[in-house]
Amino acid sequence: MKRILLITMIACITAVSSMAQTKSYRGFVEGGYGAFVGSKTGSVLSLSTSHGKMFGPVFVGGGIGIEQAWVKNESYIENYVSIGLFDGWRGVKTFKGINVPVFANIKGIWENKKISPTFDVKAGFNLGMAWGLLGEAGAGCRFDLGKTALSATAFIKGAYEEESLVSDDSKYVEGWFTSLGLKVAWEF
């Protein structure tokens, strides 16, 4: 019994040490808020994570997130009574929806100073309320805290909802969504 326990402990310790992160591995957890600009009005609250590797001062990785969006319905009609099966959207003041962005991520990070500039580019696909392609570009400042870092980034984000993917009851969400906002990221 002691021998089996010893072998099990050695196997567990070996497995844990073999999964240790390499020096070039980086992970980011980002929280952000954006406001829609252009033909759509509303806001979006987001939380995402990206993981990948550093190649010199450039991070290359991928990520996933979750966003809660509120879009004002410009076609809202007070006390609207639905006539057809799918025209009830006219009686809704605000659409609330969840998006799940899946993206590739490239960041430029200059690590030789306590405070340094950064850039961030994301491209991918949105699943949820705004189903379609997405792109995001941002620039900001990184604060080195030793083994970890914080960064603040101002961004512009675009998501495209194709008309053919939209059902009749959510006609307002078709077309381009563009938002401006601020993200704060924790780097590990």
Question: What are these model-derived regions, one by one?
Answer:
Residues T49-A152:
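Gram-negative (and chloroplast) outer-membrane scaffold detector with strong preference
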Residues E30-G34, F86-R90, V121-A123, S164-S167:
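Extracytoplasmic loops and strand-loop junctions of Gram-negative outer membrane beta-barrel proteins
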Residues A35-V37, Q68-W70, F125-L127, G158-S164:
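Feature marks short, surface-exposed loop/turn motifs that line or immediately flank catalytic pockets
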